[in-house]
Amino acid sequence: MTTPLTAKDFASDQEVRWCPGCGDYAILKAVHKTLADLGVSKEKTVFVSGIGCSSRFPYYMSTYGFHTIHGRAPAIATGVKLANPELDVWVITGDGDGLSIGGNHTLHVLRRNVDLKIILFNNEIYGLTKGQYSPTSRQGTKSPSTPMGSIDPPVNA
């Protein structure tokens, strides 16, 4: 009989490098706990991410991981799942990575109904670039890229 895994078993030994107070910490801890509660196998779990603050996620998991290029996590994750259908494949993305740069890939992976889990971190800004507005930024958001306020209405994610 094997000992059930705990949330701590899913945490890697990598230093978490998000900004103090960032909500990404809470998401990471919730995923650690959820995987343990579900009895998921570390050896059959893969996290695929693109670029952005959220995309550091695979480094912080004691599972398999793939840190790919901006917006392409859904495409890579699809390939992982098709080649290894027994794996539990997760896409980790942010509002900029998943809804702007990779919006087309996100749309098509949803349309194809690939057996993936997608966690989209929506902070309404490109955090890694320190404040560029994103597809989910509220209209009027002032940022380095929109000093007069964004004119675009947000995508409802």
Model regions: which residues?
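Active-site diphosphate/adenylate-binding microenvironment
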Residues: 4, 8-69
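Generic structural "secondary-structure junction" signal
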Residues: 12, 20-21, 59-63, 68-71, ...
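Thiamine diphosphate
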Residues: 53-127
